[in-house]
Structures are given as structure tokens and as C-alpha cells.
Amino acid sequence: MSCPFFIVKKTAISIIFCTFASMKMKRLFLLFLLVVMANVSALAQYDFLTAHRGVIKGGYDFWVYQPEDYYYSQEHTPVVIFLHGASLCGRDINRSRRYGPLDAIVRGREIPALVIVPQNPGGSWNPKKVLDVLDWTRQHYPCDSTRVYVLGMSLGGYGTMDFAGTYPDRVAAALAMCGGSTLRDVQPLGQVPLWIIHGTADRAVNVRESKKVVSALEAEHNDSRLRYDWWQGANHGAPARVFYLKKTYEWLFSHSLADEGRPLNRTISIDRSELKNAYTDMMKNAPKPEVIDGEEDEL
């Protein structure tokens, strides 16, 4: 008696039965197949948001978002790291979902990437701790290590430039808004396609903080991968809607560590006037990701 074969695909399911000796065996096989199909469907049709607490000794707690098609893409999936601002610091990991990519996903923005969101308990972002989160995620979630991106605003803008400048060989592109850098030497940022956005009327973080980075890179003729926008009259919170724009992620995803010379994409632009329509093309009735609590024991 030959064996049964079954092929399960996302768009179609083909079932080829061999001849069974009894109807009972056939019914048992049908039951087994239904269970398998249900499990594959559960993996393939839903996106997940998992909280990981205490998995890195002395490190950050963090969220990992798995996109809907992750079951199929896995090692081809890009990674987006979001570093939040000071207003979201604290021990409650849910604070980091108040704005940014995770909130955009809940509102209906499709982001086809693993999205990593560390929770900063307070103080400046620590680049090594962010790297620890990235490395832990790579060990537990197959992904494309040549397409790792980081973005953030305010304190997260500082964290974005500090992380990209500390590990330029790990970051395919970075987007830093209304921040600056605490690095003594910002020249390694010249290796990374970097987009800086800052409002000229920012009273929380003066635009001079971003301009210092730009001036330092330009002074060394190290700005071929740098672009920047000074939004006239924009306050500190104005750039927040950038996280909700589709083209933000299109710009990030257009870069790869595998690109020869690592050129900067200057084709995709974001005009301040676009922010008012940041939510208009979202999938309003899209199901929200399933939220899962992760491990709580330290490694």
C-alpha cells in the first residue's frame, strides 16, 4: 500500500489520496489532515506580537512583532528596530506601544518585517544593550541580517544615531528624528545611509543637536550617505507621524548591507504636508496582531 501525500500552500491546497484498505483508515486520515491544516492556517494567517521579559540578563525587555507572512518568509524577513522617546521610558513594557511602528500596525499599517521594540527603563539608550536584543532576536527568529534598520525620535533619535554609529556594519539604514548623538566620534555614521529630520521650532531638543552631526560629517567630506530635512516651524512632536507613513518603510527597505557601496536612496522623500494623510491608506478593518507573553526567566 502506498503512502498518502498532501501538499499545503497558502493560496491552494491539493490533496492526493492513495487507496486505503478500509474506510476507517480513510476517516482517520481525514481527521489527521484537518488537524494539520488547522495548525498551518493558524501559523500562516495571523501576525503575532510577543513580549519578552527578562530573557537577557541586565538587558532590555522588548517586543517582537512577526508579520502575517513570516511563516513563509523567515530568513528573508527584514528587521526594524524602533527606539522610543523619553516619555515612554519606564518598567512597563506596554508603554512602548503608545506610538511608533507597533501602534501603526494596530491602526492598520502593514509593515512586512520583524519589528523589535526594546523598553528603555530610563536614561540614554545603550547601544550594546540594543545589540543584545537584536542578537537574541536573530537567534530565535530567522531573519535577513543584511536588512536591519533602526529608527527613532527624541531620545530614540539619539539612540538611533548612537546605535548606527557604534555598529555601522550591522545597520543597513537609519532614520533619526528630532535627536542628536552622544558619540564622541560620529564619523562611523558616514558608513550608514542616514536620514535626519528635525523641526526648527523644536523646544525639547534644539535642532542644533542634529545639525552638529551633519556639520561634523560634512567637515570630513563624509556625508555621501547622509540626507537631512529641517522642517521650518515644526515642533518636537511633529515628526511622530512619519512612523505611520508607508513610504517610511519603503525607504528603509530599499537599503541592504549587500548593496555595493551602500548607496543612499534619495528618490523617496517625505514632505511635511504628507503627515496629515498618514492614516488614510491604512487597512482600517485589519485584524489586530495577537499579543503573546514571552519568556520571563533570565538566560
Regions found by a protein language model. Give the residues of each.
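Active-site machinery of serine-nucleophile hydrolases
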Residues: 77-79, 83-131
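Short beta-strand/loop motif that positions the catalytic acidic residue
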Residues: 190, 195-198, 202
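Gly/Ser-rich "nucleophile elbow"/oxyanion-hole loop immediately N-terminal to the catalytic nucleophile
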Residues: 69-75, 123-154, 168
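A conserved short beta-strand
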Residues: 170-181
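Short beta-strand immediately N-terminal to the catalytic nucleophile in serine-hydrolase-like folds
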Residues: 150-152, 177, 197
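Active-site-adjacent alpha-helix of alpha/beta-hydrolase-fold enzymes
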Residues: 101, 200-226
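Histidine-bearing beta->alpha loop at or near hydrolase active sites
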Residues: 199, 228-238
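A domain-start/cap signature at the N-terminus of enzymes
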Residues: 4, 15, 19, 42-79, ...
